[in-house]
Every structure is written in structure tokens, then in C-alpha cells.
């Protein structure tokens, strides 16, 4: 089995070319003051670059590793509407002005993603047949019934499904019901992020790959971005690093708890997988330690859960865990071989809401996506471009904020890591 070589299965199977390896990328840093420098080459950074360049701003992305190297390339690939919180909790947290606006924009989030895919002909295996939030227990179904009622009251296309209906969509009788969200779908996330890079480059944005940002300094009316390849001057800087935020800006990463999420993919299963998720919906469940499940375009099955990869051999904990989950869901499937495994990071905030921080004059960071990176990164990239072209910050989907340390964030990360490892060990061995 191949482990994170170097990113995920998605990198191997993406049909969208990487423009930074095809002779199209400008690796040099501009020697003039530009409008916006963007640190990070994932969904957020490239959406920001695309929308800024399309609006006539000179934008340049600086990425230390490779396009999609962080959470964007390690994503499950579920293009979901909304966030983890149900609509009532969002209204309660954001109030009567921001709450409805946030819900409207995030309800439309999948449409924004699929519109970009269509407009720029991004090759990312886009499938829009919905996603399934599956009840792991009767308590999970009760929570889904409440969530369903709230979305239906807003006129959104979601269906509450009984156990038999979920079995028909998944090929498994293991679930206690579910919520089918017709707004949503699935993609190859590396294909999508590469497509954003191609579109941003075509719109005039610059890309510097393999360049590490070392520091930020305010210099008169602009920022000096210090890198290991020289300095770049920009009137505005957007930090687009989310769960991969380092110590570049003091205290920024202290506002979120970082957890890990792993995935493991089977070999090609061919016709053996035809009756499993025949509509190719992606699925995740209501369990406290979440489990996700989907198929790729080549009929591989992808199993995911919270935590890191534990062992890469056939007797490794993660393979045992995944094998037992598959046996429980599809006892007739028989034994399968696993081909690829990887894990990535998720940035969790205390209230499960994302943030748009203004760190200083002309310095912004969208951050804290709580596992909803595809839609949030895409939407917040558009929001950054809107801000930089004159939109009133009051028109954002949530208030501009400043970083605040999340109490015990580092300790929580370690505790979660231990709990997720224990979950894998217990379910993999017993």
C-alpha cells in the first residue's frame, strides 16, 4: 500500500493537469508593488487569486510545496451545503442580520463550486447527485429529522430517508436512515484545485511554487513579503493556509484546534462495487467520531475517519479498521486490498463557525473551516476579491474578527489525537 505519495490518491487520478509542472507558471516574484499577495495554493488562495485577477487586480500566489499540498489535496471531496451547525444554531450564533445571509450564501455554496467547474471546464470528476448524511443510530436519525425540518422551512431541496431508502442508495442495511441533500455532490479535490490554478493563471494571476514565506513587514502603504526567493511588495496580503497555518503571524494558529482526518482507498473493484453507492453520492455519518465513505470514478471505495494513518502494512491498524468497516457495511463484498492511504489536517473553531480575520491594515486571513474546505474556501476567495474591490465589510457573510486564542487548543488537539487513535485500535482489533 502506498502512503501519502506525496499527497493522496486524488493526485494520482486527477485528469486536470498541474499548470505549475507544465511550463505555464511564473515562478519568479514580481519586482514591483502588486495589489495582492496570497500565501497558500489551496482552494482559498486560488479562489482568491482567480476572483481578484478576474476583477482586474494584480494577484500573486506563493505556495511552499505544491498546488493542493495541504487540506485541499487531502479532502474527501464532498461538496456540501451549509456547515456542521444546523441552521438554527447559525442564526443563534450570528444574529438576525448575519445569520440569514450566512445561511443563504452557504446554502448556495455547492452551486458556486459547480458553476466554476462548468465555466472553466475543470476536469475533476464532478458528480452532482447529492450527498447522504447517514444516521449511525436512532439518536442520529432524530438529529437529522430536526435538521431536515429546518432546511425544508427554508425551502431547500433535502429529503429525509428511512432505513430502506438509505439501503437503496447505498447498498447497505447498516444505517438507521439519512438526509439526502440534493444541493451537494462530489469531486476529485486535486482536480478542482488544479483547475482553479489554471483558471487563475489564465486570468492573469502569478504563481510561485516551492517558495517559502519567511516573514511579513509593514512598509509604508504596503506589505513586504519576505521569502526564501526574495521579497515581494503588495498593498494587501491574504494568508490562505487554514489548518496548515504556521508561526508566520504570531498567535494566529492558537485560535483553532487542529485535528487529523485519514482516508484509505481500495484497489479497483470493477463490477464488485456497482451496487455500492450506485448513484455515486458521498456519505458521512452522525457518529461522534465521524466516518465517511464514497466511490471514485474507477470504482475504488474510499473509507475515512478522524485520526491519522496507523501502520501501512496489511496488518496495520488502519487497514484492519477499514476492512472491518467494509465487512459491517457490505458483508457480501468479501476481502479487498487497499491501495493508497493518507491523512490531512482540519482546523476546528470553538463555535464551529469559520472566520475572516483582519490581522492588520491590509492583512487578511479566512480560516477555521471545520472540515468544509471546498465550499468555504471557494466562497471566501470570492469574498476576499469583493472586499479588495470595494465591498463594504458589513456585507460579508459573517463579521470581520480578530484572532483570539482558543482555550487549551494545543491540549485538545493532543487529546483528540489519542481518542481517534484509540477508536481505530478498538474497532480495528475487536
Where on the chain are the PLM-derived regions?
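C-terminal catalytic lobe of FAD-dependent flavoproteins
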Residues: 308-315, 319-428
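Helical element adjacent to the flavin cofactor pocket in flavoenzyme catalytic cores
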Residues: 150, 178-235
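N-terminal Rossmann-like FAD-binding beta1-loop-alpha1 element of flavoenzymes
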Residues: 36-61
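Rossmann-like flavin
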Residues: 93-199
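Glycine-rich FAD pyrophosphate-binding loop
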Residues: 54-74
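Active-site substrate-recognition segment that forms the wall
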Residues: 111, 119-127, 213-215, 231-271, ...
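Glycine-rich active-site loop/strand segments that organize a redox cofactor
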Residues: 74-105
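Extreme N-terminal leader/targeting segments of oxidoreductases
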Residues: 1-36
Amino acid at each position: 500500500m502506498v502512503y501519502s505519495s506525496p499527497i493522496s490518491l486524488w493526485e494520482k487520478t486527477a485528469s486536470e493537469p498541474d499548470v505549475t509542472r507544465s511550463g505555464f507558471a511564473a515562478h519568479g516574484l514580481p519586482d514591483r508593488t502588486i495589489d495582492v499577495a496570497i500565501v497558500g495554493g489551496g482552494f482559498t488562495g486560488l479562489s482568491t487569486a482567480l476572483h481578484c485577477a478576474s476583477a482586474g487586480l494584480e494577484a500573486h500566489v506563493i505556495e511552499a510545496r505544491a498546488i493542493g499540498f495541504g487540506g485541499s489535496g487531502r479532502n474527501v471531496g464532498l461538496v456540501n451545503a451549509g456547515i456542521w451547525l444546523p441552521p438554527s444554531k447559525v442564526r443563534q450564533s450570528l444574529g438576525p442580520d448575519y445569520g440569514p445571509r450566512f445561511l443563504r450564501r452557504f446554502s448556495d455554496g455547492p452551486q458556486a463550486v459547480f458553476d466554476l467547474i462548468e465555466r472553466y471546464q475543470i476536469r475533476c470528476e464532478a458528480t452532482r447527485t447529492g450527498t447522504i448524511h447517514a444516521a449511525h443510530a436512532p439518536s442520529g436519525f432524530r438529529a437529522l429529522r430536526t435538521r431536515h425540518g429546518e432546511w425544508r422551512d427554508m425551502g431547500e431541496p433535502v429529503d429525509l430517508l428511512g432505513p430502506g431508502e438509505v439501503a437503496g442508495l447505498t447498498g447497505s442495511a447498516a444505517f438507521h436512515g439519512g438526509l439526502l441533500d440534493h444541493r451537494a455532490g462530489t469531486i476529485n479535490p486535486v482536480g478542482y484545485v488544479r483547475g482553479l490554478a489554471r483558471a487563475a493563471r489564465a486570468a492573469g494571476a502569478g504563481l510561485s511554487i516551492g517558495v517559502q514565506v519567511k516573514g511579513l513587514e509593514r512598509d509604508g502603504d504596503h506589505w513586504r513579503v519576505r521569502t526564501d526567493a526574495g521579497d515581494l511588495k503588495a498593498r494587501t496580503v491574504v494568508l490562505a493556509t487554514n489548518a496548515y497555518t504556521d508561526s508566520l503571524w504570531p498567535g494566529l494558529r492558537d485560535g483553532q484546534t487542529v485535528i487529523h482526518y485519514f482516508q484509505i482507498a481500495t484497489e479497483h473493484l470493477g463490477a464488485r462495487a456497482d451496487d455500492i453507492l450506485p448513484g455515486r453520492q458521498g456519505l458521512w455519518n452522525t457518529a461522534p467520531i465521524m466516518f465517511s465513505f464514497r466511490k471514485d470514478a474507477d470504482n475504488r471505495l474510499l473509507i475515512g475517519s478522524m485520526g491519522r494513518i496507523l501502520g501501512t502494512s496489511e496488518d496495520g491498524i488502519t487497514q484492519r479498521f477499514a476492512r472491518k468497516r467494509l465487512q459491517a457495511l457490505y458483508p457480501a463484498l468479501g476481502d479487498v486490498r487497499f491501495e493508497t492511504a493518507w491523512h490531512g489536517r482540519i482546523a476546528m473553531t470553538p463555535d464551529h463557525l469559520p472566520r475572516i480575520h483582519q490581522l492588520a491594515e491590509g492583512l487578511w486571513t479566512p480560516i477555521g473551516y471545520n472540515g468544509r474546505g471546498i465550499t468555504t474556501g471557494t466562497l471566501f476567495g470570492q469574498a476576499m476579491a469583493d472586499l479588495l474591490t470595494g465591498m463594504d465589510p458589513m456585507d460579508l457573510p459573517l463579521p470581520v474578527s480578530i484572532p483570539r486564542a482558543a482555550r487549551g487548543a494545543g491540549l485538545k488537539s493532543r487529546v483528540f489525537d489519542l481518542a481517534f487513535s484509540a477508536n481505530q485500535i478498538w474497532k480495528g482489533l475487536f
